[in-house]
C-alpha cells in the first residue's frame, strides 16, 4: 500500500521542478490529465455498460445478408422464369432463445465481429497518455539528469532566499541612483583640492593604461551588514555554485535527453494522427454478426447493436483534438530548441544593467537549465547570477573577513620585527580586513598568500606606514591610496606569483628608497617597460632582484644611475653579460648571489665608489683578480663565502682599507701572511674550510673584533691571537684543539666564545679574566664547565640573563 506520506513526498518532488517547466510543459501536463480522464471514462463505460446486444436473430438469410421472407419471395419471382418452381420457405425451428443463449451470442459477436479499435480504444488512449507522460518526466527521473536538476533546484532556492541576494540587488539599485550625484561631487572635489588635481593630472599624463589601478568604490548607504551566520551561508552557496558549474558545464546530457523526449512526442503525435482518424470510421452502431453457432441456437446470423459506438466516436474525436494540440505544442518546442542556441547563455544584458560586470557566460547543460528557468521566470536567473560574480563573492568575503578580524584581534597580531618596527603580518586570508586601517601605530604591513588585496583610500589613516611587503599576492591600489603611498612609502618588497608581472603602480612611488623584487622577472619584460616608470623612481637607492637572468637588465643600469645598492640573486642561473655594470658609477654596495660566476667580473673594478661586494654562492675557484681591488679605495667589505676557492692570493695584502672579509664555506687550506697586512680588519670569517693552523702574524690585526674558524682542522691556537685585545666574538668550534691557552683571559672584551666540538679536557681558570663573557655566550660541552673553579662558574651564571 502507498501511504499518504509517500504520496505527499511524491507531489512535493514534482512541484519542486516547476521552475524548470516552460509553459508548454505545463500545457502538456494538463492535456495529459484530460487524456487520462478520457481513457478512464472510456474504460469505465466499457466495463459497466453492455458491450454488444444481439437480440434479433436472422430467420431468413438471402444473398449473404439477413432478409425478411417477403423480400425473398419477391426476388425469386423476378428472377425465376419457371412459374412452377417451388418457393423456398423457412424452416419451422423454434426461434425463442433462452437468455443464456443471447448472452452467449453477445459474447461471441463482441469477440469475433466487433472491430479491434472499438474494443481497445480506452486502452490505446491510456497507453498513449502514459507514453506522453513518460516522455515529459523521463528527464526528471533519469539518474544522470535528475541528480543535476535536483542539485540545481536546491541551489536556486537557496540563492533566491539568501539575504545576500537581496542585499546585492538593493545595492545595485542604490549605486545606480547615487552614481550621478557622486560623479558631480567628485568633480567639485577635484577642482577644489590641489592634491587631487595633481593626481588626476598625473593619471592623464600616463601614456599607457593602468591595470591594477581602480577608482574608489562607491559605498552604498542602503547596504546592510550580514551577520556571521548569514555570511557563512552565502559563502557556502558560492562554493556550491562553483562546484555545480564546474560539473554541469562539462556535458550536455540534459539538453540531449530533453530534445530526444520532444522528438519521441512528435513521432508519437504523427503516428496517432495517422491511424486514429482512419480507424475511427470502423466504430459503428449496427453490427451484422455471422457466427457458426446454428447447431446451438438454430440461427447463423444476428443483428447486433454496439451501444457505446456514438459516445466512443465523440471521445475519440475529442481525443484527436487533444493530440493535435499536444502535437502542435511539441512541434513548437522542438522548433524552439533547434532554432535557439540553448547551449550558450549570456548575461550581457544583466551585466550592462548591474554593477556586477564580471558575471560569466555559461554553456552546455548549465546554459540550457537557465534558458528553461527563464521561460518560467527570468528573475530566477538574475538572482542566480549574483553567485556567479567574483565581485559579489569578494564583497561577501570582505564582510565575513571584517566580522572575523576585529580590531582587538588585529592588535594582538602586531609585533616588533628585527628592524625594531611595528609590523602586522597577515597570512593566507581572503582579503584585507577593513579594521587594519584602524591600527595607526603600524609601520610595516606584510601581506602573504592573499589572492586578491585591494588598498582603498582608508590606507591614508596609517600615518606611520613606511614599509609594505606583498608576497605571492595580487594587490590593487585605488587612486587615493596611491597618492598616499607616493608620499609616505619608503620600502616595498614584492614576491611575484606570475612571471614578469610587476604592477604599474610601483612606478608611481616617487619617494620610494628601497625596492625588493623577487620572482621570475624576464629581462625582455624588464627592458620593455615604460621608461617613464623607472625614471620616476628618483629617490630609489636600493634595488633587489631575485630571478633567473642572463644579464643585468638594461633598464636598471641606464635609468637608475643614482642607485647605491644593487643586489641580484640569480637562483643558480649563469649571469653572462656584466659589462653594463660600468654605468652604475654611484653604486656603493653590489651583491651578485648564485650567478654561477667562475671569475670575478672585471666590470666591478670600474665602480670606484664601491664599499661592499658580496659574491656568495657562486662557482669561484680562484680570485687572482683580487689585486685589481686595490683601485677601489673605498672597498671595506668583501664577501666571497660559499664558493670553491682553494687559496687566497698574496695580493690580498694590497686591500689596506678592508674591514670585513668573509671567506667561509670554501676549500682554503692555508692563510697567506699578506692577509694580516689588512690591519683595518675587524671582521674575519674563515669557517668551514680546511685550515690546519693560524699564523702567529694574526696579532697584527689589532682591530679584529670578530674571528671565526668553525669547522676546520686547527690543532693549536697561536699566542698572537690573544694579542687582539678588541676581540669580542671568537668561534673555534668543531676543530681539533687539545687545549685552550691561558692567554684567553687577556681578552677582556670577549662576549662570545665557542669551543664545542673539540678535544678539550679542561677549561683554563683564566677565563675569569673575560669579564664581558657570560654563561649563555660560552658554547661548550656541559662537562667542561665542571672543570672551572666554582667562583668562575658562579660569575658566569649570575649574568646569564644579560647576554
UniProtKB/Swiss-Prot annotation:
> Can the keyword Signal be found in this entry's annotation?
no
* Sites carrying sugar chains: 78
Q: According to its UniProt record, where is this protein located?
A: Cell membrane; Endoplasmic reticulum membrane
The residues on the Cytoplasmic side of the membrane are 1-25, 141-261, 329-803
Residues recorded as bearing Phosphoserine in the entry = 186, 196
UniProt keyword list: Cell membrane, Disulfide bond, Endoplasmic reticulum, Glycoprotein, Ion channel, Ion transport, Leucine-rich repeat, Membrane, Phosphoprotein, Repeat, Transmembrane, Transmembrane helix, Transport
Protein origin, superkingdom: Eukaryota
The LRR repeats lie at: 464-486, 488-509, 511-532, 539-559, 562-582, 586-607, 609-630, 634-655, 657-678, 680-701, 703-724, 726-747, 749-771
Cited InterPro entries: Leu-rich_rpt, Leu-rich_rpt_typical-subtyp, LRR_5, LRR_dom_sf, LRRC69/RLP, LRRC8_Pannexin-like
Q: What is its main location?
A: membrane
Query: Catalyzes what?
Result: chloride(in) = chloride(out); iodide(out) = iodide(in); taurine(out) = taurine(in)
Q: Which cysteines are joined by disulfide bonds?
A: 55-304, 109-289
Query: What GO biological process term is on the record, naming one?
Result: cyclic-GMP-AMP transmembrane import across plasma membrane
Q: Where are the transmembrane segments?
A: 26-46, 120-140, 262-282, 308-328
Per its UniProt record, what PROSITE patterns does this chain match?
A: LRR
Residues on Extracellular side:
47-119, 283-307
Q: How does it assemble?
A: Heterohexamer; oligomerizes with other LRRC8 proteins (LRRC8A, LRRC8C, LRRC8D and/or LRRC8E) to form a heterohexamer. In vivo, the subunit composition may depend primarily on expression levels, and heterooligomeric channels containing various proportions of the different LRRC8 proteins may coexist.
What domain comment accompanies this record?
A: The volume-regulated anion channel (VRAC) channel forms a trimer of dimers, with symmetry mismatch between the pore-forming domain and the cytosolic LRR repeats, a topology similar to gap junction proteins.
Which PANTHER family does the record match to this protein? LEUCINE-RICH REPEAT SERINE/THREONINE-PROTEIN KINASE 1, LRR RECEPTOR-LIKE KINASE
Family, per entry = Belongs to the LRRC8 family.
What's its job?
Non-essential component of the volume-regulated anion channel (VRAC, also named VSOAC channel), an anion channel required to maintain a constant cell volume in response to extracellular or intracellular osmotic changes. The VRAC channel conducts iodide better than chloride and can also conduct organic osmolytes like taurine. Channel activity requires LRRC8A plus at least one other family member (LRRC8B, LRRC8C, LRRC8D or LRRC8E); channel characteristics depend on the precise subunit composition.
Q: Per its record, how is this protein called by name? A: Volume-regulated anion channel subunit LRRC8B
Q: Which organism is it from?
A: Homo sapiens (Human)
